[in-house]
C-alpha cells in the first residue's frame, strides 16, 4: 500500500514540475474515498484563485464519493474560475489515474468552459 502512495506522489511531483516550467495556472484535483477537492492555483503556486469540493454545504447533502458528485464539483470549479477571470488551466491530477471521478470532474470543467 505504501509503495502505491509513494508512486502516486512521485508522478504528481513530476507533473507539477512540468506545469511550473510552463508557467500556467493549474487545476489541482485531490480525491479521498469519501470526498473530492479541486483548486485553481496561480502560476507561481502561492495563491488559490478558486476552489470547490464535496465538503461544501450544498454538495454535502447528496452522495459525495461518486462520479456524479465529481461532475458537480467540476461544474462549480469552472464557474468560479470564470468569475475569477481564468479561462485556461493546466490539469494537475495529482498522480491519480485519469479515470472515474477524476475524469468526470475534468470533463465537467471542460463542458462548462475551462480550457485544458
Curated annotation (Swiss-Prot):
One of its GO terms (cellular component) is cytosolic large ribosomal subunit. GO terms for molecular function: 5S rRNA binding; structural constituent of ribosome. Keywords: Ribonucleoprotein, Ribosomal protein, RNA-binding, rRNA-binding. GO terms for biological process: translation. Pfam families: Ribosomal_L18p. The keyword Ribosomal protein applies. It comes from the Bacteria. Part of the 50S ribosomal subunit; part of the 5S rRNA/L5/L18/L25 subcomplex. Contacts the 5S and 23S rRNAs. This is one of the proteins that bind and probably mediate the attachment of the 5S RNA into the large ribosomal subunit, where it forms part of the central protuberance. Belongs to the universal ribosomal protein uL18 family. NCBIfam families: L18_bact. HAMAP family: Ribosomal_uL18_B. This is Large ribosomal subunit protein uL18. It comes from Alcanivorax borkumensis (strain ATCC 700651 / DSM 11573 / NCIMB 13689 / SK2). The lineage of its organism: Bacteria, Pseudomonadati, Pseudomonadota, Gammaproteobacteria, Oceanospirillales. The gene is rplR.
Amino acid at each position: 500500500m505504501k509503495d502505491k502512495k509513494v508512486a502516486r506522489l512521485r508522478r504528481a511531483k513530476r507533473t507539477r514540475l512540468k506545469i511550473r516550467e510552463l508557467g500556467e495556472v493549474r487545476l489541482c484535483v485531490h480525491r479521498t474515498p469519501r470526498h473530492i477537492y479541486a483548486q485553481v492555483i496561480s502560476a507561481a503556486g502561492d495563491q488559490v484563485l478558486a476552489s470547490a469540493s464535496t465538503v461544501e454545504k450544498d454538495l454535502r447533502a447528496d452522495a459525495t464519493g461518486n462520479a456524479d458528485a465529481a461532475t458537480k464539483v467540476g461544474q462549480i470549479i469552472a464557474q468560479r474560475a470564470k468569475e475569477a477571470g481564468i479561462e485556461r488551466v493546466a490539469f494537475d491530477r495529482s498522480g491519480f489515474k485519469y479515470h472515474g471521478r477524476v475524469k468526470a470532474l475534468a470533463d465537467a470543467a471542460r463542458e462548462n468552459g475551462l480550457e485544458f
